[in-house]
Amino acid sequence: MTINSKIELPNKPNQKFDVSKTFKIDSKLSVKGFKDKTEWVPEIDEGYIFDKETTLSILAGFDHNRRVMIQGFHGTGKSTHIEQVAARLNWPCVRINLDSHISRIDLLGKDAIKVRDGKQITEFQEGLLPWSIQNPVALVFDEYDAGRPDVMFVIQRILEVEGKLTLLDQNKVISPHASFRLFATTNTVGLGDVTGLYLSLIHI
């Protein structure tokens, strides 16, 4: 899989899924997803058991284009839950772990040297964030509260439903795809901790 390619799907979801049958929870709701599966759609775990309250919250994010954050202890399956919902809706899903090694450049992109017609040229190579925004992708930020401050400022721009991403180096403003969705998982709910692990939440 490569982020240089565009995901070939309809601009908007084109199939309805019965929540009760699809996720085996008590609900009379139906949600929209995609009819066809692409390479970016997670594999379905047939044995996965869905928590009703969490599932409905995630589905609200998909169906109504709402930003959803899931909080829980480490290793409780927060990101997996989002992935398994996306898998059943045939919704492409990308996870980015916001550990201390992820930088602003990693998200937005950088200049790269490429060979074209036998000559070396410098060309801007988009990162995962601009690519995701321009495609029907459910983007999941893992360990949201561990993100570096410079990274969090970049993410802040797209928290609004119609939030546009500005690439200053490229003089470019990117509008989100109609089926772009944003999720996050977190451990501390903004409280930080005494170990210094969650850099973006240390109170000064």
Show where each model-derived region lies.
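AAA+ P-loop NTPase catalytic core and its hallmark functional loops
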Residues: T2-L201
